[in-house]
Amino acid sequence: EAASTGSMGAAVVPARHGLKTRPAMELVDDLRRRYLDLVRDSLTGILNEDPALEERVGGGRNPFDRAKREAGKDWPASALSMIGAKRMLQLQRASEFVIERGVSGDFIETGVWRGGACILMRAVLAAWGVTDRRVWVADSFQGLPEPDAARYPKDAGNMLCVFDQLAVSADEVRAGFARFGLLD
């Protein structure tokens, strides 16, 4: 049975077995929000309370710290993003802003780690039914380089280059997109 038009011209999902239903656009907006909430929480490891990587590497078993994960203050052991829930929500809102206002262009992330932020951008495009944009992924896929303190004095002493966990292959990133059904 197809959706009908309500008294105000809005599509209404037909009632089944006496169930009360909502206007179709309200339902679509709610389902889009729920889907993107679920994707964000999964990508950050909040959904399954993924412990921080340093606890796993160090052999300890500290409990999941939601406040740290929301702020992006830890590296998840298996989740696909380290930027935290607050930044992921901001990224979603920024992506939706340009879609809603018709700003043209593709999306890109430079330095993707496991690909979580670009997977979210791709999920936003899918949730909004956008088919004329791409999400570009740019990375060396070799981890971080040694700091060049001569050119970038503020990088002196930064030793993130020693963490092998930051080197994630392009195939691993593609696999992350595929796990969410978003690999093009």
Question: Where do the language-model regions lie?
Answer:
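S-adenosylmethionine/decaboxylated-SAM
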Residues: P23-L36, S42-A85, R101-D184
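Short, low-complexity intrinsically disordered segments enriched in A/P/G/S/L with frequent Arg
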Residues: A3, V13-A15, L19-R22
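Conserved alpha-helix/loop element of class I SAM-dependent methyltransferases that forms part
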Residues: Q90-R101
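Extreme N-terminal basic, low-complexity initiation segments
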Residues: A2-M8
